[in-house]
Regions:
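HotDog/MaoC-like acyl-thioester-processing domains
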Residues: 1-5, 86-133
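A generic structural signal for short beta-strands and their flanking turns/coil linkers
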Residues: 7-11, 29-31, 74-78, 92-94, ...
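Short, surface-exposed, charged/polar-biased interaction segments
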Residues: 30, 41-44, 61, 67, ...
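Generic structural detector for well-ordered beta-strands
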Residues: 10-14, 81, 128-130
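Mid-chain, well-packed structural core segment of small domains
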Residues: 66-90, 94
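Hot-dog-fold acyl-thioester-processing enzymes
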Residues: 1-73
Length: 133
């Protein structure tokens, strides 16, 4: 696929307790913010259990590797920030827009954003990608 500045794509996922459990099994991230409702309430800062940040960014990895730029693509660098927690049960939508395409190398710069079902941004930033294929 030839990339064009301004090209955009998105993909969505509803995050469940099972996603959080599988991610914890794979990574060992068993932070009580993801599993212990009493702990979360005691913080006084969160409404409910939150998902691991890696689940949120993982949707961006899927988007880049599958949709845009597509198969054979990896991140070279990422500069993003989490702007709000993502709760179990949220439907998040990852979006990417091509900001620049290198003239002679399979490299591009993307603007990325992840939003929850209410439209609230939960992550935003930029990333550079390299496409092997």
């Amino acid at each position: 696929m030839k990339l064009v500045v301004g090209q955009q794509v998105s993909r969505s996922l509803t995050l469940t307790t099972r996603h959080v459990e599988i991610y914890a099994e794979l990574t060992g991230d068993r932070n009580p913010l993801h599993f212990d409702e009493s702990f979360v309430r005691a913080t006084g800062k969160l409404d409910d259990l939150i998902v691991q940040g890696g689940l949120t960014t993982g949707l961006l990895h899927a988007l880049v590797a599958t949709d845009l730029p597509g198969p054979g693509t990896v991140f070279l660098s990422q500069n993003w920030k989490f702007t709000a927690p993502v709760y179990i049960g949220d439907t998040i939508t990852a979006q990417a827009e091509v900001l620049s395409v290198h003239a002679t190398k399979p490299v591009c710069q993307l603007r990325v954003r992840v939003a929850r079902q209410t439209g609230e941004t939960v992550l935003e930033g930029e990333a550079w990608c390299y496409r092997f294929a």
